[in-house]
Amino acid sequence: MPTDNENSMTNVEQAEKYWQQFLTAPALTDDDKAIAKQHHDVLLTAFARSSFLAETIIQKPSFVSRTVEQTVEQTVEQTTEQDSDEQLQKNVDKEASSPWVAMYRSALDITLETVKTEDDLLKALREYRNQEMARVTFLDVLNKQDISTSLERVSALADVLLTGAYHWIYQHLAIRYGTPQNNGEDMHMYILGMGKLGGKELNFSSDIDLIFSYPEKGETQGGRKSIEHQQFFTKLAQKLIQALNKITNDGQVYRVDMRLRPFGDSGPLVMHFAALEDYYQDQGRHWERFAMVKARVINDDNSEDVKWLNSILHPFTFRRYLDFTTLDALRNMKKLIATEIRRRRLNNNIKLGAGGIREVEFFAQSFQLIHGGREPALQSKSLLRTLDALTELDIVEKDVTEQLKHDYLFLRKVEHTLQQCQDRQTQTLPDSAWQQAALIEVMGFDSYSTFLNQLDATMARIHGHFNELVEESQDSHSDEDQLFIACQDAWRLSLQEEEFAETFSEHLSSKDITGVYPILVAFKDKQRNYRIGQKGEDTLNKLLPEILYVLINQHPNHISQVLKRLLGVIEAITGRTTYLDLLLENPDVLKQLVKLCERSDWIAQEIKRFPLLLDELLTPLYLGQQNTDIHTSKKEYQLELRETMLRIEQDDVEMLMDGLRQFKLCQQLRIAASDISESLPVNNVSDKLTVLAEVILEHVVNAAWMQMRQRYGVPSHLEGNDKGFAVIGYGKLGGYELGYGSDLDLVFLHNAPRGISTDGNKSLEAQQFYIKLAQRIMHLLNTKTLFGQLYETDLRLRPSGNAGLLCCHIDGFEKYQTEEAWTWEHQALVRARAICGDVGLLKDFTRVRHTILSQVRDSKSLATDVCKMRLKMREHLLSKNNDKVDLKQCVGGITDIEFMAQYLVLANAQSADSMTTYPDNLRIFDTAVKARIIDPSTASKLQKAYLKLREQYHHLTLADTKYADQSEELDAIREQVRQHWDTLFGTCSE
């Protein structure tokens, strides 16, 4: 790949540099050199247009003859067999009619016959992939084949590499475990190719989206060791993914993405047909229907099984009735795309940008989902064939579909050329001059500006057709709306204060006029210094009157204060006109922004810091009555996070961190907005914030594990998907009591036996592996990006605190808690619970926790320890501001109630087992009542006081302040809590 210095070279200079490197390549033979010199000019041209091709041939000079001579011969043969794009489109749904599959399979089968080990398999697959992709690149950059042929060849090669690897691994696993059986016949796992692979329209440098499934449960037969079908196919899937995905000295075959499978990363790698059917019937979502349109079985090992599988997927994808709900789903997906473009600033992206490849795909797929149940012609996997069918069925005019086909193929050619330059999955136009030169040479343009003009026109046409499909009407103002006229005058004219007062005399009080005028004038003065271009200035001039209009119409209290918050948001987004457009084009979004800024300075500041949150106002889900079941909330977050992360490359750590932070910010805004809109009960705010953190933690752990596994392998004692690792939540996370901005108290545990190491090329002792895993998790959580920190974390509650290991063995944890822990550490353990990890290890933790909390304790000594710790905390943490109240640390505050709950557990668990069941204060008090430790009246008063104090604490955060004002109501609550404290602890509390 070219360096920064090389980026300043022309593409011709790049080509000459590559030619000299080729001539001095260690593996170059005289025959290869002679062939290369014979084709010097054509090779130099190809090198100038693709550094991937040049570097591949330098590394493997023997590819020269196969790339240059055999490719030219092959092109002549194929031209006679494939006369037109129409024939290619007919072939696309029938693998057997594609000559490329037969050609590739024949050659790869010969290669794989000599492969004996998995390492040899990986090498053979990569060498064959590189050889054939070099041939495709050579033809493409010299324009010796059209883009339709190139797409089909790349897809056929993927099919063959996938099935070749699959069958080799299947046969070798069968030697050890036997074969899965179904009525006496060998049973296979079926590989569903999704997306462009399914449609035989694969990118040159693409990942592949797969789903694995097999017919039925059972056990293998005929091997040295029989195992369940699920185990067999899971092992097969894992080895297949590794064979394709692993990066070796020879590169990678494909990046494999399994996130489209049922339940995403949290789901099993392989599912039997019945489980697959249950999932899509009960839980399949709209976006999964879009994805399933292109699903294709890659390995047709048993036609009856494939029919069975298709009979499951077909009714989910294609409804028997006209399904116009698809358009609503498409509108939502359009908004997601627009959101992604804004957040990732993808303005030069030919796939995701407005009028990009994705919009053509959605255009075709939406009609497939609406009409496909009744029109078999619309069930094709091929986008081009689908567009033809839309015209044949009189659904879309021919001039529209022909234009879309032409424009789509133009964009695919651009995409292919971009990716063939360096074999990188990119759809973004290049910045470097040599890459721009290479691009326009292949595309046939005289200059880059001419190419950009053609590209802009192409994408504008596509975007126009897409918008016609999903357009929605917009609100407008009446010409007689006097308030709106006043708002326009206030912004557009340089009104003096007296004129401003007269203009708004019928709409605002004199006090509000006095407050609003200087704020508006100051903002207008600032705005003159903004360098936002004519379009940005025009948008701002249209938007400001709308803001004033909505603000005055809503009659908020403290109107000048709300305007100041609103203009703070506008100032933050002035340089990003897409967000100004968002507010201008969506009146409901603007109305919601005004409401939220009125009710919460914290929300206003969050939106100011992270303008991406404006996208959440497009669909204000927080306005409806919220689900309050904690398990349902968690499931909803899991599904939404899965959908969010599908848009991010698995190996892009920076985008992973940004995606998680964006997800958290958006969900946290929804919770806060629900809170202040009173659509979410106060005691459920913490529930939602807590399960949100759990879901994000699970994803972070899985991502960190994947990164560690790629580098070091996994500890050798593990089987299947086990990690031998667990995350324990303490404090507010453990007690289901997270607030806005709470940090996470975490402890990491593992259960690896002594002497175990990882099985990767770079092996580590298991303890070191788990410490590095913990460090990786902390990095993903703590790193500050443009979107802030995911969570601030605190590991000081682990055994031995900061002096202890970052990840402790479960046996060491138990020994420490039994022999060394202080009373305050056992208090902390009351609020600890298992968050995520291996089931067996989580059960071990729960057992240890119960054992420790149930120890026999002297109640008087315990009370003394608890009181001393409380006084010590108050001395260090209580605010010295006597005019305000620190709700957490004050006498009769939140922490006093928490300490009382912890004392009740530690003092009584030895005689009342149930006291260790729950980690949260409210249920601890309920349990204490059932165990007759405290009376119902006391429990009820403490619970009500706790909820009231927490409610106030949440609202202080939303008001962006730390301490509460003194009030009679607050004094009464604190006095009541203090009395219960004195009753429980007596003289030791003094």
Curated annotation (Swiss-Prot):
InterPro entries: GlnE, GlnE_rpt_dom, NT_sf, PII_UdlTrfase/GS_AdlTrfase. It catalyses: [glutamine synthetase]-O(4)-(5'-adenylyl)-L-tyrosine + phosphate = [glutamine synthetase]-L-tyrosine + ADP; [glutamine synthetase]-L-tyrosine + ATP = [glutamine synthetase]-O(4)-(5'-adenylyl)-L-tyrosine + diphosphate. Keywords: ATP-binding, Magnesium, Multifunctional enzyme, Nucleotide-binding, Nucleotidyltransferase, Transferase. HAMAP family: GlnE. This is Bifunctional glutamine synthetase adenylyltransferase/adenylyl-removing enzyme. Its EC number is 2.7.7.89, 2.7.7.42. The keyword Methyltransferase does not apply. It comes from the Bacteria. GO terms for cellular component: cytosol. Residues 484-990 are annotated as: Adenylyl transferase. Involved in the regulation of glutamine synthetase GlnA, a key enzyme in the process to assimilate ammonia. When cellular nitrogen levels are high, the C-terminal adenylyl transferase (AT) inactivates GlnA by covalent transfer of an adenylyl group from ATP to specific tyrosine residue of GlnA, thus reducing its activity. Conversely, when nitrogen levels are low, the N-terminal adenylyl removase (AR) activates GlnA by removing the adenylyl group by phosphorolysis, increasing its activity. Belongs to the GlnE family. Residues 1-474 are annotated as: Adenylyl removase. GO terms for molecular function: [glutamate-ammonia-ligase] adenylyltransferase activity; [glutamine synthetase]-adenylyl-L-tyrosine phosphorylase activity; ATP binding; magnesium ion binding. Its cofactor is Mg(2+). GO terms for biological process: regulation of glutamine family amino acid metabolic process. The keyword rRNA processing does not apply.
